[in-house]
Amino acid sequence: MDEFVTAEDLVHEYSVLQEPDSVVNWSRYIAAKRDDPCSVSWVYERCLQALPAQWEVWREYLQFRMRLLDGVCAVQHAAEFEKVNRLFWRCVEHNAAVVEAWRLFLGHAQRQGALALVRQVVDAALRGVGLAKHRTVWEDVVAYIEELLPAEETDLGEEQDLHELVRGALFGGAGAEDAGADIWSSAMLRRYIQVAEDAEAVLALLQRTHDYATVVAVYEKHVLPVTRAKHKGRQSYESQFRYLVALDHTGATAKLEDAVARCAQLFPERAPSLTIFLAKHYVKQGNYNRCTDVLTDSLKHTAKSSEFASLYDFLVVFEESLIEVVLEHLQEHPENEERWGADLERHTDQLDGLLADHALLLNDLKLRQEPDNVKHWLDRVELFDKAASKASVYADAIASINYKSQTVPGQLGTLWWQYAQLYIDDGQYETAKTILDKALNVPYNFLQDPELIWTKWAEEELKRAGLDAAMQVLSHALQIPDDHELLRDKFESHEKMPAQTVIFSSLKLWSFYIDLLEASSESDEHLERTKAAYEATIQLKIATPLLFVNYAHYLQDKGNHVESFSIYERAVDIFPAETAFEIWDIYIGEALKYGLPKEQIRDLFESSLKMANEGVECKPFFLLYAKFERDNGMIETAANILHRACRAAQTMDAKRSLWTLCLNWCRQELGGSYARALYEECIQALPNHVAVVYVLEYAKVEEGLKQVKRARALLQYGARLLHPANNADLWEYWELFELRHGNKDTYKDMLQLKRKVEELLEGDGLPVPNQIGNIAFVASTDGLQNPGGESTNINNDELELDM
């Protein structure tokens, strides 16, 4: 005692001797000795003998002793650590209910890596503290275990190299060995899961111990029953897959198969990867046939392209890997060829078949996705070479397809026809006709389907038996029922009427039928039958403009020109103006060629020109009409027609070309005086940038008529329409005009006007409004004649321009 007590300590000695239960006195004594570790420990020991249940003092003392071991190797200085261990045991003997004491002890034991001590401390702590504190103790243990265990494999074994897996299963030694199981950690976790709130989290940690037998046992005891009891069935995929991995490692094939099936039901999007996982398990077990069977069966049932691709690719790689591994082995051990020869040949055949059947397997997938898609069935037919196989596909298609779900016109009819064509090509025409009969009883959604079948059947009869047989087939199809309008209305209003009920309205069949009739004999009977067929299409309101034209031409070929023109008359009344335009073009051309009376032709032209009121550009008819009148010597009438054409033109290009033609025609045929009123109207009707061309042209006409003042007034007007920079032709002509007819004053006035126009239009560059209607031209010495031939009054007022 003397070695620890100094003269300065006597006061503290007296105080602790007088009051040994005073924590304050002991704390002061300890504080006075803080610079000497041995003395501090001596005082703490005396204090704790006096106050053995004082946890605060124990905590200070234990933390003080543990700080002394900071940075010290627990192995080299095991004795020192053991001293602290004994202190902890003394502490918890008197403070068993203090959970903080146990946690501090656990931390010290974990620092030493003493697993046996950790387990002893945990056992004692769980006995000492209350049940409510057990989870707190376990949290420290679990945290320690997490530090001990390796990180979890993110792929949980899904990405094992298949080549090495096959090699290891076949010949051993090549596959990677499982890491050793951490039995201590798995045992601790197995105890902890009984009180843990999140069993799946504990299972994830248990997986990292590689003690797969324990993983299986824990999952089946603590996770699976809870899931079933709550009727959830949806614990995380990762949790279930850890169970599968554990079953795989323990070789529990039967359990694994059941678990994979259950997991695939809960997580259907994971079905392909689960199938591949199970296939790998069979590879490890050496059960290659079962591996192939599972993959092949999955290929036949999957309905997703991505799943199909992953399964197919894995199966191909498996077969390739197995063949490659066996070949490598035989290169090193040729004496084993007899042992592996049969297996090698079988798997080579399986690989060849798998590659050869890829298109067929892919088609199977498409048909599972869209069993009513006719195109997929037609594609499937092309995958077979033998007629019997093709016929089987057609039969399967017909039995499988839902006719009501069809959305592509003509596809279903194509399927039926190709089915019949198969027997036709094989010389079994009667069987083919039986198939066609059945095909025509199918409730198609679209007219194109029965239409195709009737057309193909008639074409086949035409090749085999001639025109009459083909016409007989078509006439049967085209029988018009009395209530044809009602049937068509119901079909077109989508009242679930099969297309076969309105086959009589097929323009394609009628056109084919008419072609056959026209190709038949020249008898009057056939003439009437042909006309009746044409009339039927008109009655059914399915006749096209081309059909009307063909009808008219047919009658012309038979010498019935007048009757053919009546067909044109009916056609132009039926179709809208845009369509009737083409018919009128043909009609008028043929009427002119045939030489109808002039008045009748004029009536045709006038009727055709009514289309202009409906917005149709009738320029060709106006020109043809004008030419007709000119050829008949009606010059002014032709001019009037061209004038009407200018007014009726729909586009600017048409207006310009027609005004140019009209004005040139009038000048040449009727003289410049006649053209004056037309020029004035033309300039009014066209925008400034176009009208200025005609103003200049008009001025030249007036100059030619010696009307200098009128020509100058026109030039003055035209000069104001555009900026001089955009009106160079007019200004150039005007300058020469003044040199020919003017004087100094008129030339000066011209230049003055040019400056004013430049100033006026320089700002925005826009032309002035066209005001030709407000201009009174200088009087002409000639009387004016309008296009209608009537004399116009002379305007005696000169033009005054506001300069």
UniProtKB/Swiss-Prot annotation:
One of its GO terms (biological process) is generation of catalytic spliceosome for first transesterification step. GO terms for cellular component: cytosol; post-mRNA release spliceosomal complex; Prp19 complex; U2-type catalytic step 1 spliceosome; U2-type catalytic step 2 spliceosome; U2-type post-mRNA release spliceosomal complex; U2-type prespliceosome. It comes from the Eukaryota. HAT repeats lie at residues 3-34, 35-67, 79-111, 113-147, 393-425, 427-463, 482-519, 525-557, 559-593, 596-631, 633-668, 670-704, 708-740. Keywords: mRNA processing, mRNA splicing, Nucleus, Repeat, Spliceosome. The keyword Nucleus applies. SMART domains: HAT (SM00386). It holds the Pfam family HAT_Syf1_CNRKL1_N. The keyword Membrane does not apply. It is found in: Nucleus. Involved in pre-mRNA splicing and cell cycle progression. Belongs to the crooked-neck family. Associated with the spliceosome. This is Pre-mRNA-splicing factor SYF1.
